[in-house]
């Protein structure tokens, strides 16, 4: 088992591994321990994932190291964990977009120092003007005096 495969297993509960194994086995018709790449999309959709054709091609390219056209169960687990993390990242980005809209009180597409200070006051945090200034300076990568959504995402990466 590779480090990547061990890491994938550590990310999943025993229950999830069993669920993935049951789905995997349904498509392993000959019991040989692998499934064809063609069946991969069907299995992933059955497990609640929604990979696009392009994502599937990219996943298969990464997972099917020997180019055999088949994927064994350990490779399958690595792939499923990768897809789950990608889906979670998309969801958290949606949640962050919602936060950004709330923080951007005047809806101009930016968070300025005043709005940033308001966020902290509303959360009960006591921050000084110097701390706000420092946060703005750290977050405002293009130095326009305000934080746009991309800058906000970068700031929040450090928080999660």
From Swiss-Prot:
Ca(2+) 1 binds at residues 28, 30, 34, 39. Ca(2+) 3 binds at residues 104, 106, 108, 110, 115. Gene3D superfamilies: EF-hand. One of its GO terms (molecular function) is calcium ion binding. Residues 15-50, 51-86, 91-126, 127-160 form the EF-hand domain. Ca(2+) 2 binds at residues 64, 66, 68, 70, 75. InterPro entries: CALM/Myosin/TropC-like (IPR050230), EF-hand-dom_pair (IPR011992), EF_Hand_1_Ca_BS (IPR018247), EF_hand_dom (IPR002048). Keywords: Acetylation, Calcium, Metal-binding, Muscle protein, Repeat. Ca(2+) 4 binds at residues 140, 142, 144, 146, 151. The modification N-acetylthreonine is found at residue 2. GO terms for cellular component: myosin II complex. Belongs to the troponin C family. Troponin is the central regulatory protein of striated muscle contraction. Tn consists of three components: Tn-I which is the inhibitor of actomyosin ATPase, Tn-T which contains the binding site for tropomyosin and Tn-C. The binding of calcium to Tn-C abolishes the inhibitory action of Tn on actin filaments. Skeletal muscle troponin C binds four calcium ions. This is Troponin C, skeletal muscle. It comes from Oryctolagus cuniculus.
């Amino acid at each position: 088992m590779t480090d990547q495969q061990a890491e994938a297993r550590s990310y999943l509960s025993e229950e999830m591994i069993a669920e993935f194994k049951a789905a995997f086995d349904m498509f392993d018709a000959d019991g040989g321990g692998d499934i064809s790449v063609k069946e991969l999309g069907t299995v992933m959709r059955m497990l609640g994932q929604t990979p696009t054709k392009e994502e599937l091609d990219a996943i298969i390219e990464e997972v099917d190291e020997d180019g055999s056209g088949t994927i064994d169960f350990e490779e399958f687990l690595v792939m499923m964990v990768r897809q789950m993390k990608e889906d979670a990242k998309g969801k958290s980005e949606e949640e962050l977009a919602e936060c950004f809209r709330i923080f951007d009180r005047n809806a101009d597409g930016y968070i300025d120092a005043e709005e940033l200070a308001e966020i902290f006051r509303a959360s009960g945090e006591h921050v000084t003007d110097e701390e706000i200034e420092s946060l703005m300076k750290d977050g405002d990568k293009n130095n326009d005096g305000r934080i746009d959504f991309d800058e906000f995402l970068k700031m929040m990466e450090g928080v999660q």
